């Protein structure tokens, strides 16, 4: 999987940062696709600065209904239709997301020429497509808000082709059945169990993408053991009380959570517009003093998961 940050500013855009939007490139050999997490104003314009085709976008996950995470959605939906894209799209979000989309389309006289499904979610598993699952966790914010945990299913281990050939199993369709863990019968009557020739399963990757939040009970479960955690660091340590009073987190709180959850990497985003480039580097240093494996997301930064 690959993360592409389309917007990394909190609340309002700056000259160098648009408001929140994160693209997830699934990069799976049998199921390509793009998922979008939040869609602040201007997201479709940010997409134009990438090589990604909006037609590949098949799922959008909205964390909450504050404008800096949502106001780009109607425009993106309409432009997708005007471009002749007919591939289905599913939107997941909290209660009210359906009314928002339908009202925006109705009042503006807009229409959508592709299948559009809107799923209003609660806490718990919201999706399992056979390759990965997505679970929503409630966060601490003035509006109903969720973070999303994306977990790939484990992949089958490598097939020991050399041992199978030595056992007299010819390559081809039988190898495919054994790779799936099935038992086959050879012409001489011998049974070969695929599980006996498979290496241990390869653990799937796990990713946690937080919406806006102050410290909360669900955060540790959401982030526990993931390879990459994306979390806001709206304000620095000296402004922690102000951040919490508005349902946000400081650098210290983001980094401390990453350390306690045992994540592989922390990526901080959603930084206040009060910080220029020098100020953003200060935020990064504060996080790294607690959790060294921290990176700062800028607009169009790409990270592998």
Curated annotation (Swiss-Prot):
Key word Hydrolase present: yes
Record-level Gene Ontology MF annotations: 3'-tRNA processing endoribonuclease activity; exonuclease activity; zinc ion binding
Cofactor: Zn(2+)
Positions contributing to Zn(2+) 1 binding: 64, 66, 141, 212
Binding positions for Zn(2+) 2 per the UniProt entry: 68-69, 212, 270
Pfam annotation, one family: Lactamase_B_2
Top-level taxon: Bacteria
Stretches of the chain forming a coiled coil according to its record: none
Family membership: Belongs to the RNase Z family. RNase BN subfamily.
UniProt-listed HAMAP family: RNase_Z_BN (MF_01818)
Protein's job: Zinc phosphodiesterase, which has both exoribonuclease and endoribonuclease activities.
Protein name in UniProt: Ribonuclease BN
Protein source organism: Escherichia coli O17:K52:H18 (strain UMN026 / ExPEC)
Gene responsible for this protein: rbn
